[in-house]
Design a protein with these regions (language model features):
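Hydrophobic, lipid-facing positions within transmembrane beta-strands of outer-membrane proteins
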Residues: 39-43, 77-81, 111-117, 155-159
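Repeated loop/turn-to-beta-strand initiation elements of outer-membrane beta-barrel proteins
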Residues: 22-24, 52-56, 90-94, 125-129
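Helix-adjacent hinge/juxtasegments
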Residues: 65, 70-104
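Sec/Tat signal peptide C-region and signal peptidase I cleavage site
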Residues: 15-20
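Outer-membrane beta-barrel "beta-signal"
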Residues: 151-165
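Structural signature of outer-membrane beta-barrel channels/translocons
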Residues: 46-50, 84-88, 104, 118-126, ...
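Transmembrane beta-strands of outer-membrane beta-barrel pores
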Residues: 28-34, 49, 60-66, 87, ...
């Protein structure tokens, strides 16, 4: 317990001493169709590795998902570490690409790896709104019927809001 507490102190000390390099926020996504109902919320923390227009960043989010599909029903928790590469920035807008992996924790079994495009708008010095649609990659979830997919999903856009320190 002491080691965990010390680790958390060091992590938060690093976060609060980093100037304009850390963001904190999250995103939400929902899918409603005839056969599928899904809702996910994903709190997130990230760190910019460079501060030039073409930036690299690393981050992770914890996804809480509740879904009802013909193959599966229930809730789960997933960890999504990713590296973000900002491709272009024009005034307050930027386009980025996340190279991500998503791993199931607890009841959510399986994993997925791939690319996720992001469009972000920096509303103020500290607040950024982001929009993401699509995922191109490999998806292996442990459904009853054993689904392996390589997909470009456009059904579940994600909307995020981030505070930049």
């Amino acid at each position: 317990m002491k080691k965990l507490f010390l680790t958390l102190v060091i992590v938060f000390a690093g976060i609060f001493t980093a100037n304009a390099q850390v963001w904190l926020g999250g995103s939400v996504s929902t899918v409603m169709s005839k056969d599928t109902k899904s809702f996910e919320i994903a709190p997130e923390i990230g760190y910019s590795l460079t501060s030039v227009p073409l930036t690299f960043a690393c981050a992770a989010d914890f996804v809480y998902i509740k879904s009802e599909t013909p193959f599966r029903e229930g809730t789960g928790l997933m960890l999504t570490p990713y590296i973000r590469y900002t491709i272009a920035s024009v005034e307050k807008f930027s386009v980025a690409l996340d190279a991500m992996g998503q791993f199931g924790l607890m009841d959510a079994e399986g994993y997925r790896v791939g690319l996720r495009p992001i469009v972000a708008w920096m509303a103020t010095k500290h607040w950024t709104a982001a929009f993401s649609v699509g995922f191109l990659g490999y998806d292996k979830m442990n459904y009853e019927h054993g689904a392996f997919t390589l997909d470009f999903e456009t059904a579940a856009p994600r909307f995020g809001l981030y505070y930049n320190f």
